[in-house]
Design a protein with these regions (language model features):
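Alpha-helical transmembrane segments at the extracellular/periplasmic loop-to-helix junctions
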Residues: 135-136, 174-210
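Membrane-interface alpha helices of multi-pass inner-membrane proteins
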Residues: 39, 43, 77-95, 99-104
């Protein structure tokens, strides 16, 4: 059952990743290759995804859905978005909370600057409100049948993790080795990506001038 759970979750993640690459007009062969790489990287070494993996998968999928919702302008993606964010938060609060606020910021930014074509901002807002209301109702029903007190849920999922995070933050020791040396390969990849993006911007500016 655990392996089946891992396979299904990773399979859904891989399919949506492939769909995302195609959405950005990457050719099918490259999309398939990169999707295989993502699927191999995403599959946990233990074979069974822990709460961290579930929260990360659901958080990334919610970002995918936001991209699809903005590009395709279909309400089904806006309906599913709150559910994925909820699944991510219930799996583990971090990184779900960071992704949640990032998604909220992007939605507000999209509302301000988007051109209302197929779907109006009002319809999107009502859709998100309706979907979020369903989630809250389902959670309350689940709490009622399971005999879970709402305050206990708040303590376990919000107050307790916040106290742990606060203690860890206060005990952090910032130094050059921990920030730079221990993560040198990650920083190297970031530098290469920045150089590649700057190079692309320069090429685009030259192309536009022509």
């Amino acid at each position: 059952i655990y392996l089946l759970n891992a396979s299904i979750l990773n399979g859904i993640f891989a399919v949506l990743t492939y769909k995302l690459f195609l959405e950005f007009e990457l050719d099918k062969k490259s999309s398939f290759f990169y999707t295989i790489c993502v699927a191999i990287l995403a599959y946990p070494s233990s074979g069974t995804p822990f709460v961290d993996h579930h929260s990360t998968f659901f958080s990334i999928i919610s970002i995918y859905l936001l991209i699809f919702a903005i590009k395709k302008e279909k309400l089904v993606y806006w309906i599913l978005l709150p559910f994925l964010l909820c699944f991510a938060f219930l799996s583990k609060q971090v990184p779900a909370t960071y992704i949640f606020f990032s998604v909220i910021f992007l939605i507000i930014y999209n509302f301000i600057f988007r051109d209302e074509k197929k779907i109006t901002n009002k319809k999107i807002f009502y859709t998100l409100f309706f979907s979020s209301s369903i989630i809250i109702i389902l959670l309350l029903v689940f709490f009622s049948f399971s005999g879970i007190d709402i305050q206990s849920f708040i303590d376990q999922y919000i107050n307790y993790p916040r106290e742990i995070g606060q203690n860890r933050y206060l005990n952090l020791n910032y130094n050059f080795k921990k920030i730079i040396i221990d993560f040198k390969f990650i920083h190297l990849i970031f530098i290469l990506l920045i150089i590649a993006n700057i190079n692309n911007l320069i090429k685009e500016k030259k192309f536009l001038k022509k």
